[in-house]
């Protein structure tokens, strides 16, 4: 049996950060990852001489990525990743909050009948951005390079106070963004342009604050995967261990042991599960727990396993043997583009439900006709 003071399960960004933080402090830590490499949704891959981003296309600093790189001394160069919003033949390169007036002008040009509603939406975006600045606009002092307790304490206290005050306000804005947009505008096309690239029922505080995040995007030189490789390499350099292609099938909390698919056992002092939550509950063995704890686990397990993802992401990777100049004319390196100002309307809601309700009788032509309209009016 392998014994470790700390075991982190899941080699995504959360697991890597947790394991590196522990290794940085000299702790005996093992990171277990079921795939052949770490990263999860943060990965890069090569195909025919082109590098593609397999998951997230860039990083959002959010006051964390930059300080993390400095804290752990990662040998990684991070580049600005400006965002372009494109609608039909119009494009706007976002330069943070100061681009809001230009964004309002763009929307009013597209929807002249809804100028007052555009103003209301921009006002709501400004209000949420002000609340979110403490989370995304300031470096977290806990990642300060030199942690002198006396000098760090005032900034931590001030940041913590702002953080909890902001979280309180955010809790009041936890409703789906669709409801908030409905209250601000009756123009479905306008609402679609602002919100249709978010997952259904995304909290309004996140959706409306996203404009501020556009200026916070960064791109690691060498790809998003280079950031992951840097984190993983630093873990092992600092004495931590990583086991790849290791899938856990049993979690025995009463005995603090894990068992993988090959039968290998691991004993831990502390466990951090940064992997799939459903996998944790499927693997959880409650037999050694008190009766009350078993009942609570069973209730929680049923609730977790009954949930499904809101939507899926379909990615198309295109390799173009062209110089950068034509792409520079069209926009920056990261673009949100909507071909038609009309937006999706009911295509992805009522029409999709109607299609699914008679799925057994839907013809191939009907399906492809719906897909063509879905792609024509969507945001990419």
Task: Pin down the residues of each PLM region.
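N-terminal glycine-rich phosphate/pyrophosphate-binding loop and immediately adjacent elements
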Residues: 2-137
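Short loop/edge segments at beta-strand edges and connector loops
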Residues: 10, 80, 228, 244-246
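Generic recognition of stable, solvent-exposed alpha-helical segments in well-folded globular domains
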Residues: 17, 64, 102, 120, ...
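A structural preference for short, hydrophobic beta-strand core positions in alpha/beta folds
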Residues: 31, 242-244
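Short, surface-exposed acidic
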Residues: 76-79, 110-122, 185-194, 292-295, ...
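A short catalytic or substrate-binding loop motif that flags glycine-/basic-rich loops and adjacent residues
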Residues: 77, 198-201, 308-312
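Active-site/ligand-binding neighborhood in enzyme catalytic cores
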Residues: 126-238, 245
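Mid-domain catalytic core of redox enzymes
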Residues: 220, 249-380
């Amino acid at each position: 049996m392998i014994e470790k003071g700390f075991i982190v399960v899941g080699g995504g960004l959360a697991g890597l950060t947790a394991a590196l933080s522990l290794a940085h402090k000299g702790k005996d830590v093992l990171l277990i990852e079921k795939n052949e490499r770490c990263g999860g949704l943060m990965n890069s891959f090569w195909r025919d001489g082109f590098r593609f981003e397999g998951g997230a296309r860039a990083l959002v600093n959010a006051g964390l990525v930059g300080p993390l790189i400095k804290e752990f001394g990662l040998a990684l160069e991070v580049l600005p990743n400006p965002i372009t919003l494109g609608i039909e033949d119009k494009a706007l390169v976002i330069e943070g909050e100061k681009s809001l007036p230009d964004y309002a002008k763009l929307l009013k040009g597209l929807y002249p009948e809804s100028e007052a509603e555009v103003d209301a939406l921009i006002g709501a975006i400004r209000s949420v951005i002000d609340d979110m600045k403490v989370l995304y606009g300031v470096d977290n002092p806990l990642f300060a390079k030199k942690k002198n307790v006396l000098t760090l304490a005032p900034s931590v206290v001030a940041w913590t106070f702002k953080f909890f005050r902001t979280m309180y306000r955010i809790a009041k804005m936890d409703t789906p963004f669709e409801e908030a947009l409905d209250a601000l505008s009756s123009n479905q096309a306008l609402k679609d342009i602002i919100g249709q690239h978010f997952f259904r029922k995304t909290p309004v505080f996140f959706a409306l604050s996203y404009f501020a995040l556009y200026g916070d995007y960064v791109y690691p030189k060498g790809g998003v995967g280079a950031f992951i490789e840097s984190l993983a390499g630093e873990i092992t350099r600092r004495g931590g261990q990583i086991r790849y292609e290791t899938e856990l099938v049993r979690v025995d909390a009463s005995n603090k042991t894990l068992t993988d698919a090959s039968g290998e056992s691991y004993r831990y002092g502390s466990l951090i599960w940064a992997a799939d939550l459903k996998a944790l509950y499927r693997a959880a063995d409650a037999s050694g727990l008190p009766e009350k704890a078993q009942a609570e686990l069973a209730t929680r397990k049923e609730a977790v396993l009954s949930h499904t993802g809101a939507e899926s992401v379909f990615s198309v990777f295109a390799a173009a043997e062209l110089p950068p100049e034509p792409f520079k004319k069209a926009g920056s390196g990261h673009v949100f583009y909507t071909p038609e100002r009309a937006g999706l309307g009911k295509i992805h809601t009522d029409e999709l439900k109607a299609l699914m309700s008679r799925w057994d009788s839907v013809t191939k032509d009907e399906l492809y006709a719906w897909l063509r309209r879905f792609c024509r009016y969507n945001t990419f």
